[in-house]
Amino acid sequence: MDWGREFFKWRGYEETVKLQEELSKKIILEDKFKELRYIGGVDTSSLGEKIVGIITILVFKTLELVEISVALSEVNFPYIPGFLSFREGPVILRAWEKLKIKPDLLIFDGQGIAHPRRLGIASHIGYVLDVPSIGCAKNILVGFYKEPDKRKGSFEYIYHKGEIVGAAVRTKDNVKPVFVSLGHKISLNTSIDIILKTSTKYRIPEPVRLAHLYSKRMLNSEIEGEPF
């Protein structure tokens, strides 16, 4: 299937920036879902010419893992800050197509609107799939924030060019915060709440943590010639 692929084609720097700016105007910044039954975690791993995309599906209330979708592809786009979705988007779409259970919301290892043009990977892919999405990054990309209190649940907003674009959220006592920004069809405060509810034992939310673990395992198995 080739649906959605046109949203990830490189068109030269100026045209690609223009595409990001156009799509960012279509991002919905409020909650557009009713019940969360299933929640997905999205991550990729790459080495050399190969990239693996993983989507984990968990029951939201219990965080029970019920499905893992894997896609393997050749890397056809260099790593360029601010254009991560063009590199990772196609393999994530392949993983999405294979899912038997489509989640009510996706959490990405990356940015939502906390992006120079307000279209990080969570916003870009959330829009293309028309699915509520959250960006949860390990590092800040744009803006500034005040360090939140050391206790789990504390957060401080991230500001960029006079706008609130995300929040630094403490998901574990005395551990570096994660950087949360809404992706699409969800508010920032709801995004923060969901990240805290899905971050149980670790700094990283469980859906994304599992996606990261499986993407590394899959990539290593492929390189070593072993079955996943």
Swiss-Prot record:
Catalyzed reactions: Endonucleolytic cleavage at apurinic or apyrimidinic sites to products with a 5'-phosphate
CDD domains, per the entry: Endonuclease_V
EC number(s) per entry: 3.1.21.7
Gene label: nfi
An annotated Gene Ontology molecular function: single-stranded RNA binding
Protein's UniProt name: Endonuclease V
Keyword DNA damage: yes
Xref: Pfam families: Endonuclease_5
Major enzyme class: hydrolase
Keyword Lipid metabolism belongs to the record: no
Protein localization: Cytoplasm
